[in-house]
């Protein structure tokens, strides 16, 4: 009960946790597990970055199973473009789904052709390496719509996957999702 275990969160990833862990080691001369979210080179978990996004999809698959279906061929709206959204999208693709949207705090992209593995790699590089904005995706790929200052919940799809921050879907958003045929939100 008296133990504090610092961890990554919005804007704090493995790099930042690694900095804190390095300073802890320097000051305490210990290499014990006092931080969660550190890189593997510091004793972190194998798939820590993927865990939340993958877990979201595993939960979704269980929900879909109760309806006698799975993700194959289903269209998905994803909000966010950070760690959780990236790995949510990756697992959707692995399970045969089609990702139509991703977003950031400025707006969202809608790609009717779908965000495939190559396009997702572009987003991961854009966001993780260059700290770019999602609108740059629309500038890179023809036929993509960028909607400034909005969330993707007004688009038609089978599934909605809020993966940005908390309190993403309000009552009006829920009505839009239902009206547009969304069968599951995870």
Residue ranges of model-derived segments:
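Mobile, glycine- and charge-enriched loop segments
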Residues: 149-151, 156-159
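Conserved helix-loop functional segments at active or binding sites
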Residues: 26, 61-66, 166, 175
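Glycine-rich phosphate/diphosphate-binding loop of Rossmann-like nucleotide-binding domains
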Residues: 39, 43-151
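N-terminal ligand-binding/catalytic initiation module
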Residues: 1-46
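Glycine- and other small-residue-rich loops at beta-strand/loop junctions that grip anionic moieties
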Residues: 9, 45, 49, 77, ...
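Structural motif
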Residues: 3-5, 32, 75-76, 97-101, ...
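ADP-ribose/adenylate-binding Rossmann-like module
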Residues: 157-186
């Amino acid at each position: 009960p008296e133990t504090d275990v610092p961890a990554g969160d919005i804007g704090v990833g493995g790099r930042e946790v690694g900095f804190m862990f390095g300073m802890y080691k320097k000051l305490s001369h210990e290499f014990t597990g006092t931080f969660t979210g550190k890189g593997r080179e510091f004793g972190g978990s194998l798939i820590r970055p993927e865990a939340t996004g993958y877990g979201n999809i595993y939960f979704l698959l269980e929900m879909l199973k109760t309806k006698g279906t799975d993700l194959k061929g289903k269209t998905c709206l994803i909000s966010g473009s950070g760690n959780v959204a990236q790995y949510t999208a990756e697992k959707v693709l692995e399970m045969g789904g089609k990702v139509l949207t991703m977003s950031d705090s400025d707006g969202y992209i809608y790609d009717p052709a779908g965000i495939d593995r190559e396009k997702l790699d572009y987003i991961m590089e854009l966001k993780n390496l260059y700290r770019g904005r999602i609108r740059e995706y629309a500038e890179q790929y023809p036929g993509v719509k960028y909607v400034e200052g909005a969330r993707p919940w007004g688009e038609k799809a089978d599934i909605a996957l809020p993966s940005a921050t908390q309190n993403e879907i309000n009552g009006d958003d829920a009505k839009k999702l239902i009206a547009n045929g969304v069968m599951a939100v995870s």
